[in-house]
A protein has these predicted regions:
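Membrane-proximal, proline-rich intrinsically disordered regions
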Residues: 20-63
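Bacterial Sec-dependent N-terminal signal peptides
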Residues: 1-29
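Aromatic-lined, polymer-binding surfaces characteristic
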Residues: 142, 146-148, 190-201
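Acidic, serine/threonine/proline-rich low-complexity intrinsically disordered regions
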Residues: 149, 214-225
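Conserved, well-structured interaction surfaces
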Residues: 33, 43-49, 55-57, 74-140, ...
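Short coil/turn linking the two alpha-helices of tandem helical-hairpin repeats
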Residues: 137-138, 144, 187, 209-218
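TPR/Sel1-like alpha-solenoid repeat signature
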Residues: 126, 200-206
Length: 225
C-alpha cells in the first residue's frame, strides 16, 4: 500500500509539471519579437521615431565638421594620419544605423499595414538611409552599399570591397526619389517629423553637392546632375 501511494505521488507530481509547461513558457514581457511587431501603422511609426534621435545632427555637428575643413584642418590633421584611426575607434565607419534601417525596410515591406501608410514609413527609412550614406560618401568617397540586412556571421558581406562612389550616389538618389514619391504631403504643424517637403529639401542639398563635385571633377567622366 505504501508503494502504491509513493507511485501515485510521483505520477501526480509529473502530471502537475507537464500541465504547467505552457504556463512556464512565457515570452519576456519587456521585449517584442518580430512576429509581434510591424503589424500596425503605430508599430511602423514607433520604430521610425527611433531614427530621429540617432541620426539627426546635434549641436556639435557643425563644429566637428569644421575641423575637417580649411579653417581648422591644421589642428585636426592628426585625425587623418594613417594608423591614427581605424574602423574600431572611428565613429563614422559604423554601420549600426544602416543595419537598423535595412532591417526596418525589410520587415515593413511585408507588413499587413495599408499600402499608402506603409510606403510612407518606408520612405522615412529610405530618406534616413540616404542621409547616412551621403555623410559616409562625403567623408570616405567609395563605401560598400548595403540595401538589405545581412547575417552578422557572413564574412564575405562584412568584409567585401567598397562600391564605387558613383554607384553609391545613384543609390542615394533612388532612395530620395522613393521618399519624395511616397512620403505624406501633409504639413506637420509641429515641424518635428519627416514629410515630402523635408525629402525635397534634402534632395536639393545633396544634388547641389554632387552636381558641383561632378562639374569640377571632369576626369571622372560622370554626368552632371
Amino acid at each position: 500500500m505504501k508503494n502504491i501511494k509513493q507511485v501515485f505521488g510521483v505520477l501526480t507530481t509529473l502530471i502537475c509539471l507537464i500541465s504547467c509547461t505552457d504556463f512556464l513558457d512565457l515570452s519576456p514581457v519587456n521585449k517584442l519579437s518580430p512576429g509581434d511587431f510591424f503589424k500596425s501603422e503605430t508599430d511602423l511609426e514607433l520604430y521610425t521615431n527611433s531614427f530621429y534621435q540617432k541620426m539627426l545632427p546635434g549641436g556639435l555637428t557643425v563644429v566637428n565638421r569644421d575641423g575637417m575643413g580649411d579653417f581648422t584642418s591644421k589642428n585636426s590633421s592628426p585625425t587623418f594620419i594613417a594608423g591614427a584611426y581605424s574602423s574600431v575607434n572611428e565613429g563614422k565607419w559604423n554601420w549600426s544605423n544602416i543595419r537598423n534601417l535595412n532591417y526596418f525596410i525589410a520587415k515593413a515591406s511585408s507588413s499587413p499595414v495599408e499600402e499608402t501608410h506603409k510606403r510612407h514609413y518606408i520612405g522615412v527609412a529610405r530618406l534616413f538611409r540616404a542621409k547616412e550614406y551621403f555623410d559616409k560618401v562625403v567623408t570616405y568617397g567609395d563605401v560598400p552599399w548595403y540595401s538589405k540586412p545581412i547575417d552578422p556571421n557572413d564574412e564575405d558581406q562584412l568584409m567585401r570591397p567598397r562600391d564605387p562612389r558613383a554607384m553609391v550616389m545613384d543609390s542615394i538618389m533612388a532612395d530620395l526619389d522613393y521618399a519624395v514619391a511616397n512620403l505624406h504631403d501633409i504639413k506637420d504643424e509641429s515641424a518635428t517629423t519627416i514629410t515630402k517637403q523635408v525629402a525635397l529639401g534634402l534632395k536639393s542639398r545633396i544634388c547641389l553637392f554632387e552636381g558641383t563635385y561632378r562639374k569640377y571633377h571632369p576626369e571622372l567622366g560622370l554626368e552632371v546632375i
